[in-house]
A protein has these predicted regions:
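Glycan-recognition and catalytic regions of carbohydrate-active enzymes
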Residues: 13-15, 367-384, 439-440, 445-454, ...
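The feature marks proteins involved in alpha-glucan
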Residues: 1-28, 48-125, 130-135, 146, ...
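Short edge beta-strand/loop segments characteristic of extracellular beta-sandwich folds
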Residues: 27-34, 557
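Conserved, mostly hydrophobic/aromatic
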Residues: 31, 76, 126, 147, ...
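Conserved alpha/beta catalytic core and glycan-binding cleft of carbohydrate-active enzymes
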Residues: 285, 289-476
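Substrate-binding/active-site clefts of carbohydrate-active enzymes
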Residues: 111-118, 127-298, 316
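Surface-exposed beta-strand/loop patches in extracellular or lumenal glycoproteins
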Residues: 29, 39, 559-572
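C-terminal beta-strand-rich structural cap/linker in extracellular carbohydrate-active enzymes
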Residues: 33, 70-72, 586-601
Length: 601
């Protein structure tokens, strides 16, 4: 570029960040701190040292230290302040303390692992801290055989980046590459990934690139990681399109590749991409997806970036070469909301725009979205655009997930809101839909414990601010009562799964139904096909009955509390594929209240 048009050297894309053991018991340290002329590396333990780092023209400070291996504790000193490494792999004493060097010498047992085809994904979303009594990666491993028997093919973890204290959903993480110490740290996560792969299951990780948590967040002291040009619901936005944003982008792309390279992660669920403000011609999210796909090709593995997006914008799941962002799939909340209102009748908050009509659910089954440009009463504007794809694998659906459960006033699960027959109806509709189904931990046996919002901050003012914020979140809803205190440890304890329920007859029957539905989905060619162009629907809003034909398979769902008899619009000699009270005779289907049936021609 002409002189004066390039103020800073280009970001050195590809260089490793943080601390790395490079052999011979030597460590390389690197941090981007362009706001500082000098940075000091402070080796805290086992032998204290202070080392002046070398700064390059782009603001990267580097040092190589002898006699330095795994377990070395260190900080960076900037303007006299001791700060943990922004690219730390481990924060053993929390977000305000020193970082620890982690070596890469882990004995993997997944040689030859290439991943799971996206079409075969049956996702199980879990929160490590409440999934088991121990709340660790190792304890989660003990449950994997149950998930395998159930029919799960991909485990998805809520964020595991280091957060304050030991109780958090994970979205308050402040060290994006440091694995939560209380869960078992980096080696614990590697053991869990390895165990999943040995059972033929993928492991997905929820990552947060739209904000950092409020406690232990010292990133702005190092450089222009944030911008004041935009705001997010959680504070300042990350700088993905301003001056020096190339380096900020690399910091987060580096993190994504770290999960893939060092932890053998099979996919990244990218949190709230709609909250990432970026007006670049080539957005950060495109860079991210491109980097993930390139690394997948290099490794010969199936690795998928999956978006959480409430934009109903098909560009999110459109390939980069077709001018999209390049995500392989996205969460589809329209499915959840359409199903939820049918089952509960709730119409407040964001459910306002989802009247309890079976025709709405039918529309979602054909396109993935309900809103494709219509006016949304809740949003007060036109919303969404029609996808151009007929690939149902582009959409991840659920009847409940951590958001939809945890962001209720009392954190009630579906099994606590509805009678068992309606839970079974919802499960069948979801598992047999032409999309990628996702279960929320415990739903497979009808867990009734709540999943509530919990934190363990150390700042009294922040604790009170979080309490007030939670109260404000429920202003649009008609729920009555006082929200549980996020800081109360009992809120966290109440949210743990009760695995002993599995031995109860009612809950065991629910688990068996889930297993049978997943087996049916897996073994029936018409249900394995996720081609939306082959989906035919017949919705009767008055009778609240939905008929769906997928190839040679017929599905019938009765969302009313009355028995319904409906004339079949589809011809065929139908035989039942699953035990059900629903029957077909003389061209009519009879459905008891809240019943479903599955037949094949």
């Amino acid at each position: 570029l002409p002189e004066g048009q390039q103020q800073h050297p280009p970001a050195p894309i590809g260089i490793p960040l943080g601390a790395h053991v490079i052999g011979g018991n030597r460590c390389e340290f690197r941090v981007w701190a362009p706001s500082h002329a000098s940075v000091e590396l402070h080796i805290v333990a086992p032998r204290e040292q202070r080392i002046a780092m070398t700064r390059d023209a782009a603001g990267y400070h580097e040092a190589i230290v002898d006699d330095c291996g795994e377990g070395t504790r260190y900080t960076f000193v900037i303007d006299g302040r001791e700060r943990a490494d922004p690219a730390s792999r481990l924060q053993p004493d929390g977000v305000h303390a020193a970082s620890e060097v982690v070596a890469g010498d882990f004995e993997w047992n997944d040689k030859g692992w290439t991943g799971v085809a996206l079409n075969d994904y049956v996702v199980y979303e879990l929160h490590v801290g409440t999934f088991t009594e121990e709340g660790t990666f190792d304890a989660a491993i003990a449950k994997l055989d149950d998930l395998k028997e159930l029919g799960i093919t991909a485990v998805e973890l809520l964020p595991v980046a280091q957060f304050p204290g030991t109780r958090n959903w994970g979205y308050d993480g402040t060290y994006v590459g440091a694995v939560q110490a209380s869960y078992g740290g980096p080696r614990g996560l590697k053991r869990l990934v390895d165990a999943c792969h040995q059972r033929g299951m993928a492991l997905l990780l929820d990552v947060v690139y739209n904000h950092l948590g409020p406690e232990g967040n010292y990133l702005a002291e190092f450089g222009p990681y944030f911008t004041d040009r935009y705001r997010t619901p959680w504070g300042l936005a990350l700088n993905f399109d301003g001056p020096r944003s190339d380096d900020v982008r690399w910091f987060f792309v580096h993190n994504a590749l770290q999960w893939i390279d060092e932890f053998h992660i099979d996919g990244l669920r990218v949190d709230a991409v709609h909250a990432i403000v970026d007006h670049s011609a080539e957005p950060f999210l495109q860079d991210l997806c491109e980097a993930v796909h390139r690394r997948a090709a290099e490794l010969g593995r199936r690795i998928y970036p999956i978006a959480e997006s409430d934009l109903n914008d098909p560009r999110v799941i459109t390939p980069i070469e077709e001018f999209g962002l390049g995500f392989d799939a996205q969460w589809a909340d329209d499915y959840h909301h359409s199903l939820h209102t049918l089952l509960t009748g709730e119409q407040d908050g964001y459910y306002e725009g989802f009247p309890p009509l079976v025709s709405n659910l039918a529309r979602v089954l054909k396109t993935g979205f309900l809103y494709t440009g219509q006016h949304s009463s809740y949003r007060g504007r036109k919303y969404g655009r029609a996808p151009k794809t007929n690939d149902g694998a582009k959409f991840v659906i659920s009847m409940q997930n951590h958001d939809q459960v945890g962001n209720r006033l009392m954190g009630e699960r579906t099994a606590a809101l509805l009678p068992p027959e309606k839970v079974r109806l919802a499960a069948a509709a979801t598992i047999l839909a032409p999309f990628l189904p996702m279960l929320f931990m415990g739903e497979e046996y009808g867990e009734k414990a709540p999943f509530q919002y919990f934190t363990s901050h150390s700042d009294p003012d922040l604790i009170e601010a979080v309490r007030a914020g939670r109260r404000e979140e429920f202003d649009d809803f008609l729920w009555q009562g006082e929200a549980p205190d996020p800081h109360d440890e009992e809120t966290f304890r109440r949210s743990k799964l009760n695995w002993s329920l599995r031995s109860n007859a009612e809950h065991a029957a629910m688990w068996t139904l889930y297993r049978d539905l997943l087996t049916l989905r897996r073994n029936t060619p018409a249900l394995r096909s996720l081609d939306l162009s082959r989906v035919e629907t017949h919705a009767d809003d008055e009778q609240r009955v939905l008929l769906v034909r997928r190839g040679d398979v017929l599905l019938a769902f009765n969302f009313s509390d009355e028995q319904r008899v409906v004339t079949l619009p589809f011809e065929g000699a139908w035989h039942s594929l699953i035990e059900s009270q629903a029957t077909i005779e003389a061209g009519e289907v009879t459905l008891p209240p809240s019943a479903f049936g599955v037949w094949q021609a």
